[in-house]
Amino acid sequence: MTSSDASGSGALAGLRPRLPSPLCEVDDARFGRRGVRLLLKRDDLIHPELVGNKWRKLAPNLDEAAGRTVLTFGGAYSNHLRATAAAGRLLGLRTVGVVRGQELAGRPLNPSLARCAADGMRLHFVDRAAYRRKAEPETLAAVLRAADAEDAYVVPEGGSNSAAVRGCRALGEELAGHADVIAVACGTGGTLAGLAAGAGGGVRVLGVPVLRGGFLAEGIRALQTGAFGGPRGDWSLEERFHFGGYARTAPELEAFAADFEHRHGVPVERVYVAKLLYALVALAEENAFSRGSTVAAVITGRPFPEQNDWSGLGPGPARRPLPRERGRAGGKGRGGETGGHGLGVPPS
C-alpha cells in the first residue's frame, strides 16, 4: 500500500489527510554531540482529529466497513476509541465502543470517554474478565448481542489487524532511505509490524513498548504473518521504558516531556510519544547509536485538548523540513533489553 492508498478512498479521501506526513530534523545537543542526527516523522500532523497511526490503521478498516456500524474496544483512556468516534462523526458512521470496566458504567464519564460520547459513539461497558476473553468467539458473540451490534464491523483493540498493518506499511515506505534507525512507541504492535515491512532492507526498526510484560514480540510476529504471510523487516524491542505500564508515568517522564516541548516547540503526547523520546535520549547517552547515523522518531499522536492545545503544531524554527534525500549511513539501534526504565531524566 502506498501513501496515496493509505489516505483511503471515497469519503475518507474527502477528509484530506496530509500524506506523506512531514519529516523534520531537530537540533538536539544530546544527539548532536555524539554525531547522531534526530529526525521527527510528524504523523501527528496527518489530520487534526484522526491523528498519526490512528489514521493509518483506521483508514483501511473504515474502507472495509463499507458504511456498516463500527464496533471496537478500549480502556477508559483509549486513544483508539477517541479516533474511532471522531471518524464516525466525520463520516456519518455509527460507532460502538466496548469499554473495559463494568464498574465505570455508573460513574461520570472522564474527558476521554465524554469526547467519544459527544462524537456519537455508543459506549458499552463490560466486566474486566469478559474483556480479557473478547477474542474468544463465544465471548465476542455475547458482547455483540449485549451491545445490540451483531451486524457491526469489528475492529480489535488498538485497531491492530491485518488491514491496519498493511496500512502502516506506507509509513515505512515514506521513511525508506531517510534513516538508519526508525523508532516508534508500541501498544498492540500493529504500527511497528507494518512500518518494519515497508522500511526495506538496511534499516533497523526499534519499538518502545508502553506496556510491561514482555509479550509484544509474539504478537508482532503474528500480525506480520496475518498481513504478509510471514515476518518482515529488521525490528527489535527496547522494553526498559514503560514506566510501569500503559498510561502510567513518573515525575521524571513529565519533566522530560515538558523540557522537550520547551526545547523544540513540539507538543509531546504523554502515553506513547514521551516514552519513545525518553528512550531515544537515554539510548543516545548510552552510545547505542553509531556516530554518523540518523535516527527517525515517529510521532504517532499529540496531546488531547485537556492535556495541551492544538495550536503551535505547524513547522517552527527548531524543526527544519528535510529535503527528500538519504540521511547519512551508519549505525543501528540496540533493542531487546528488558526490565523497568530504571533511569533518571536523561542528561541535558
Question: What is the predicted role of each segment?
Answer:
Residues 1-324, 346-348:
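PLP-dependent amino-acid enzyme catalytic core
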Residues 326-328, 333:
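A cross-taxon signal for low-complexity, glycine/charged-rich
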